[in-house]
């Protein structure tokens, strides 16, 4: 362990052109780490609070840096993150901002790894690390909060579950992305791209399912291994209190109809992953869907759990879902994220590590996914801020970090 001697904070751009927080952590023995905070578009009601970048930086300089510089060792992540909590003084990081907190937390972890001369995933891994690598979930067709005039379902995700290596999986997802482009072109369907690089055509959800199914089948035949797909439904964005149901272009589905609809799609397309299929406050509906299809697919809580151990425990008690999405900025520190993963693992839930729609070239989540033996990592298929993580996964597998 080595004492933190300086922390530098600045504004940088994220992938949407918005300001975010970058942190540098330096130690007395020459260790260095840099972390950048991502930002979400489809955010859960219970997420940690992100402040405007300038405000988050000013608050962190005033409250957090004096508790860290000359006081805490970079190699002790739990102490670093406890100091961030103490500096903030709230339960949602509304004091210094989750964006400043997570940037500092990630930078300190990297500085600690740098001092040890170890890859970040080894520094974070502890007893988690198994022999497998996460399968990347590639966002191929997008709508919802990520793209206007597109599908109601927010993400259609390629899942190369049969890939023999991370490298093959990454290139398979890129090929599915290109194949969907070609299918759209053949159908004279123009499509721009959403926040995460997914195609955003003006098609119905049913046509998007059909296109994805055709694309993954074609690419699976070309690559010679199984490729499935999954969904991020973003159910909280579809649910409307006044309508008392899930609002689609073709009408409103009741909770019972939404459960039946998603369960039917799992059966029809053999989906391997379904994220936030229902509203973020409806543990009972999540439990009902999990009882129906939980032995066939991962029913993953993102807005439902927000990387929060208390909300996860409530879900475990209710048998709601069978997996949790892990987003460090959603809870504010790496320690909080790892605590959620530990609880999930102990309770038989899988943990899926994820990017945000507003991303940076930071690669911390690639290391976190490897360190914690995650079955999947959500980090897009194309775009520099996405491929930064994917290429890092390839390097990790090749022992080149």
UniProtKB/Swiss-Prot annotation:
Chain positions recorded as Mg(2+) binding sites: 232, 275, 302
Gene Ontology cellular component list: cell surface; extracellular region; phosphopyruvate hydratase complex
Major location category of this protein: cytoplasm
Compartments, record wording: Cytoplasm; Secreted; Cell surface
One Pfam entry name: Enolase_N
Cofactors named for this entry: Mg(2+)
Pathway(s) of this molecule: Carbohydrate degradation; glycolysis; pyruvate from D-glyceraldehyde 3-phosphate: step 4/5
Domain of life according to the entry: Archaea
The keyword Transcription appears for this protein: no
Record-linked SUPFAM superfamilies: Enolase C-terminal domain-like, Enolase N-terminal domain-like
PROSITE patterns: ENOLASE
Keyword terms, alphabetized: Cytoplasm, Glycolysis, Lyase, Magnesium, Metal-binding, Secreted
Protein task: Catalyzes the reversible conversion of 2-phosphoglycerate (2-PG) into phosphoenolpyruvate (PEP). It is essential for the degradation of carbohydrates via glycolysis.
NCBIfam families in the record: eno (TIGR01060)
Active site: 196, 327
MF term (GO), any: phosphopyruvate hydratase activity
Residues where (2R)-2-phosphoglycerate binds: 154, 327, 356-357, 378
Co-factor: note: Binds a second Mg(2+) ion via substrate during catalysis.
Documented EC number(s): 4.2.1.11
Stretches assigned to coiled coil: none
Alphabetical list of InterPro entries matching this protein: Enolase, Enolase-like_C_sf, Enolase-like_N, Enolase_C, Enolase_CS, Enolase_N
Source organism: Haloarcula marismortui (strain ATCC 43049 / DSM 3752 / JCM 8966 / VKM B-1809)
Swiss-Prot/TrEMBL GO biological process terms: glycolytic process
Membrane-crossing segments per the record: none
The protein, known as: Enolase
Catalytic activity: (2R)-2-phosphoglycerate = phosphoenolpyruvate + H2O
């Amino acid at each position: 362990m080595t004492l933190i001697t300086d922390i530098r904070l600045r504004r940088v751009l994220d992938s949407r052109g918005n300001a975010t927080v970058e942190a540098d952590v330096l130690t007395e023995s020459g260790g260095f780490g840099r972390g950048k905070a991502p930002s979400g578009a489809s955010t859960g009601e219970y997420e940690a609070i992100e402040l405007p970048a300038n405000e988050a930086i000013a608050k962190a300089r005033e409250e957090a840096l004096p508790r860290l510089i000359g006081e805490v060792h970079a190699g002790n992540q739990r102490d670093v993150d406890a100091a961030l909590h103490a500096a903030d003084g709230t339960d949602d990081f509304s004091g210094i901002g989750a964006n400043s907190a997570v940037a500092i937390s990630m930078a300190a972890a990297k500085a600690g790894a740098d001092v040890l001369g170890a890859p970040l995933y080894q520094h974070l891994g502890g007893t988690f690390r198994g022999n497998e690598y996460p399968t990347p979930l590639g966002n191929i067709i997008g709508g919802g909060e990520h793209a206007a005039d597109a599908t109601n379902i927010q993400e259609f995700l390629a899942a190369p579950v049969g890939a023999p290596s991370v490298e093959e999986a990454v290139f398979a997802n890129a090929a599915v992305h290109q194949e969907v482009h070609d299918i759209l072109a053949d159908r004279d369907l123009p499509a721009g791209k959403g926040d995460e690089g997914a195609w955003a055509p003006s098609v119905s959800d049913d046509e998007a399912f059909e296109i994805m199914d055709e694309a993954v089948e074609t690419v699976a035949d070309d690559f010679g291994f199984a490729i499935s797909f999954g969904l991020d439904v973003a159910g909280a964005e579809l649910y409307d209190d006044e309508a008392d149901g899930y609002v689609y272009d073709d009408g409103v589905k009741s909770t019972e109809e939404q459960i039946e609809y998603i369960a039917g799609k799992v059966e029809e397309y053999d989906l391997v992953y379904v994220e936030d299929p229902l509203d973020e406050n409806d543990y009972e509906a999540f439990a009902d869907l999990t009882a129906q299809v939980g032995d066939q697919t991962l029913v993953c809580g993102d807005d439902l759990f927000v990387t929060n151990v208390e909300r996860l425990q409530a879900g475990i008690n209710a048998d709601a879902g069978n997996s949790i999405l892990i987003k460090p900025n959603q809870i504010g520190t790496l320690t909080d994220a790892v605590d959620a993963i530990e609880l999930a693992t102990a309770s038989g839930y899988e943990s899926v590590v994820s990017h945000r729609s507003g991303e940076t070239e930071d690669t911390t989540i690639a290391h976190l996914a490897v360190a914690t033996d995650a079955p999947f990592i959500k980090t897009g298929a194309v775009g520099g801020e996405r491929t930064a993580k994917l290429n890092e996964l390839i390097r990790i597998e090749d022992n080149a970090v």
